[in-house]
Amino acid sequence: MSNKMWGGRFSERPDEIMEDINVSIDVDRHLYAQDIAASKAHAAMLAAQGIITASDAKNIGKGLDTILSEITKGAFEFKRALEDIHMNVESRLGELIGPAAGRLHTARSRNDQVATDFRLYVRDTIDDIDAALAAYQHALASRALDHAGTVMPGFTHLQTAQPVTFGHHLLAYVEMAGRDRGRFADARKRLNESPLGAAALAGTSFPIDRHATAEALGFERPMANSLDAVSDRDFVLETLSAASICAVHLSRFAEEIVIWTSPLVGLIKLSDKFTTGSSIMPQKRNPDAAELVRAKTGRVIGALNALLIVMKGLPLAYQKDMQEDKQGAMEAFAALSLAIRAMTGMALDLVPDEARMKAAAGEGYATATDLADWLVRTLKMPFREAHHVTGRIVALASKQGVALHELPLSAMQQVEPKITADVLGVLSVESSVKSRTSFGGTAPKNVASQAKGWLKRLEKQRK
């Protein structure tokens, strides 16, 4: 005879292999706080509806509080034979309060129970990630304000394109993180409905109040369809999608840190706090933190892909396949949270080599567009013609082995006789960035204003 809580139908014990593949406590033990919170709300509702006595509900609540304390203190024994967090908690509750524990599962199934637990867990995770992203944004915006006028090369195709400021570059990642926070907020809004009370799949004949349990757990409303309630994992997929995009953004910045810290580039330095050495090469300073952030992106995206594949062919309603929804997601969320904290630390730690940045900003004829713009504004030349003329001047400078601002005026006039000496005033990297005053442009005053705006918004959000 089976000794499982569901074992009344069975006359034999499960095979050992069945036990191994079926058990989930090693993963869903992390849902203990959410499971206990949902059980307390359910017990209170059952009592309010007259389904169980107030005395039983009180004892259940006290017992659950004891279990929460035991788990928090590390004094709780998780038993693999009980399969999951639900049965572990209920079994211990029975040891603490006796038969009244058996009334807790009235009008409830593990199907709606785990769906509720995991929604609460993901909601809590989103809140934690949002707070971490806000701190990341603050770090970037504060550094952007410090370096609103620090000139550096801007790149396209990883080739020097136009001068920008370091602050402007950092603010690009503030904007990305803002969109990431928006995606997480959207996911949170959609997940914030309660499956509790859907029971196995069809609802229950008991006169439960699903609105009461939804409100008690901070949900906006109960889910409207019991089949959907127990079989939906969109909320995990959507959150993993937001996490994947966020991880890609972190990875892009991490990649730049790896490139910029290379001695061949040398635009920034990281301190000993965020670098490691080599076991054989004493001189090495490796940007391992940035590299690991870059690598963790694969874990996050992999979790999204894995769960999409798990869910793609599942008929309604609950299937045991869904037990595989948690481990990858939990690991992905943990990896993302760590990556955000690491990038925040590096953002505060990195030191730009301002002289090297300025010198690099002028390489590769980066102010060529400024010359073309001058031809358009001053000589009223059509831009396409100005583009062609500038290209010929760049070719001439390249042939002579000089920068644009070093090319003699007479040489420029060989290409376009109408060019005057005041053209030299637009060819420095400083004048280039100062001229980019269009909204969203890299002009230092723009950057300082946007950085201050972000810091003000973030401070307001804290309150």
Swiss-Prot record:
Top enzyme category: lyase
UniProt cross-references to InterPro entries, sorted A to Z: Arg_succ_lyase_C, Argininosuccinate_lyase, Fumarase/histidase_N, Fumarate_lyase_CS, Fumarate_lyase_fam, Fumarate_lyase_N, L-Aspartase-like
Keyword terms, alphabetized: Amino-acid biosynthesis, Arginine biosynthesis, Cytoplasm, Lyase
Coiled-coil parts of chain: none
Subcellular location: Cytoplasm
Keyword Cytoplasm: yes
HAMAP family: Arg_succ_lyase
Family, as annotated: Belongs to the lyase 1 family. Argininosuccinate lyase subfamily.
Protein name: Argininosuccinate lyase
Gene Ontology biological process terms in this record: arginine biosynthetic process via ornithine; L-arginine biosynthetic process
Organism of provenance: Bradyrhizobium sp. (strain BTAi1 / ATCC BAA-1182)
GO cellular component: cytosol
Pathway this chain belongs to: Amino-acid biosynthesis; L-arginine biosynthesis; L-arginine from L-ornithine and carbamoyl phosphate: step 3/3
Enzyme Commission (EC) number: 4.3.2.1
Catalytic activity from the UniProt record: 2-(N(omega)-L-arginino)succinate = fumarate + L-arginine
One Pfam short name: Lyase_1
